[in-house]
A protein has these predicted regions:
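Active-site catalytic microenvironments in core metabolic enzymes, especially phosphate/sugar-handling
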Residues: 1-238
Length: 238
């Protein structure tokens, strides 16, 4: 099986043409005709990730975030990114990134968050023109929960003791919106769609004021919101 076979398979759930314009997705390093000996799935391609791939004899890394994001003018190992890229090249390890192509997938990052939270009847929060792709998801809890109980449930679900949240509204939690990664841009959409709670990451201080008592905003952390992406990719590839 070649890298192209794997990339074609990944593009069935995360077509590259549905990635955001600013992003850098697809095969970043390597030749698509290369035979795949082993695949390492990761959230970020760190130097330790490449070392692990070498140790485990994996010549393809499937990463959520792209190690090459804004472009490189030189690859001489002077910066961290260059060092990682150079090590991958020297060891004939290809790197493929999905990032916002998977973010915009109906079965992508936010869908996995819904699954972990046990939401039902969920659909895309910010659908694109085709209606089948877009950022975030919104769905229902099987049973309503008190906000305090939902906050505890959220911490447990995302395996963290530290979350940030806006002032509780005093309402029961029925409808929940989620968006993996940085999601402050969708706060107004979550409110418009009558979500009781919006879970995402990287909210700034003043973003919490946008709740205006209409919604409970929860910032679980960037990594925490995307941590299940590895599971999603492994499940799809195996």
């Amino acid at each position: 099986m070649t890298i192209k076979n794997i990339s074609d398979y990944l593009e069935e759930i995360a077509p590259l043409n549905q990635a955001e314009d600013f992003d850098n997705v697809g095969l970043l390093i390597g030749n698509e005709t290369t035979e795949v000996e082993g695949i390492l799935v990761t959230l970020d391609t760190l130097e330790e990730t490449v070392d692990e791939a070498i140790k485990k004899k994996c010549n393809l890394i499937v990463s959520f975030h792209p190690i090459i994001f804004s472009g490189l003018k030189k690859i001489n190992g002077n910066s961290y990114v260059e060092k990682v890229v150079l090590k991958a090249i020297q060891n004939n390890i290809a790197i493929y990134a999905t990032h916002t192509a998977l973010d915009n997938s109906k079965v992508g990052v936010s869908s996995k968050m819904c699954e972990k939270l046990g939401l039902i009847n969920y659909n895309i929060l910010l659908p694109k023109e085709d209606g089948n792709t877009g950022m975030g998801m919104i769905g229902d809890l099987p049973k309503p929960m008190q906000e305090e109980d939902f906050l505890k449930f959220t911490k447990k679900t995302f395996k963290t003791n530290g979350i940030r949240f806006s002032n509780p509204t005093g309402n029961l939690v029925n409808k929940v919106a989620v968006l993996g990664g940085s999601g402050s841009f969708a706060i107004a959409d979550a409110i418009h769609k009558k979500a009781d709670v919006y879970i995402s990451a990287d909210f700034k201080y003043h973003d919490f004021f946008k709740a205006e008592g209409k919604i409970l905003l929860i910032d679980v952390g960037h990594y925490e919101s995307e941590q299940f992406t590895k599971n999603l990719l492994v499940e799809y590839l195996t």
